[in-house]
């Protein structure tokens, strides 16, 4: 069993049923390969949730609970690990221990002796990407050395998806961990147990009274803080923090060391907030972000009405993005992959607008950050379209009571950018001569004939508006 088998089961657990043709196309496997995968999985699944082919569908009744139980049954003696998985697990172990004997450590993966050597290129690529060094200690094993802050940040990214936040901000294992992630979570939670409690207390008593972090930001902070406290206990302090001084940060004074606090403050500033007081003022960056905002506002069709909110959101995003890109503090997000194709002009415009900031802070924004910035701007474009575009003036001609028409009006308001200056009875159509309007709406045939007889243009729709009615109204340039 390997990672593909688990991915296949996870997809079926999410969707219950999958057409055979789609499965072959989605996973790039032949039907015979998929059948072998199903057979392998069924050996560890209860019979009532077996995978089976039903005509042209692959189906199962497995739920999340059965899926979690299945993963607990998958041990390394039945799971073929990849080099990337083994290296990620070892990378965490090298952070949690001063020296690790790789040959001994790899025995848990049930692989051949030569696998350790074969995995070396993958390990070198990982550590060199974070400016770290794997030092050989004769007759003992290997030691991970290099910039202490970079080391912690890199290892946090390997741990993050394996844990969740439990009660009282305490980290616990993710319930549906695959074998490698389960191994990583177990060693982290075991080795850092006292520090996890200490980190939760620091967050509750020192940090949360000042800011409110979103779930993912809070989880990252708790992982980093637990790891930092564990490393500090073993004598691995951050001895130099000049690399963390490229932006002004708010000081939380969590740890008893200036260098440690400087790096922790920077890390917190990069995270996702649900409530962020304006504590991240960097005078130099403010000037550059103002220029960036002006560039973005110059794009045709954009009018920003609430410039304070606009600047604050762009500033906070760029501030965090600089830190995240410098230290690789972000994950890929498939939902953002299509942004460049959908909005190519905006993509190019955003790239140009942030170029000056990238150059001056010696970083390069990832595609994920560029896509996010495009969506922030599109959000303001949609918001401000409601402010900028004149509302369509609609008058409803009806003999119905106000209470009944009130519902109809609210449905229209929820779907269209309109104003309804009046609702008039058919017997009052003479008033239309004195009213300014763009469109008349009615929902009865009787009133339609009266309006037609009076030579007035109108649209007749159903009181219970249908999709066809919405289409008809959009044809009247209601948006």
For the regions a language model picked out, list residue spans one by one.
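A cross-family "folded-core" feature that marks the main globular domain of proteins
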Residues: 2-479
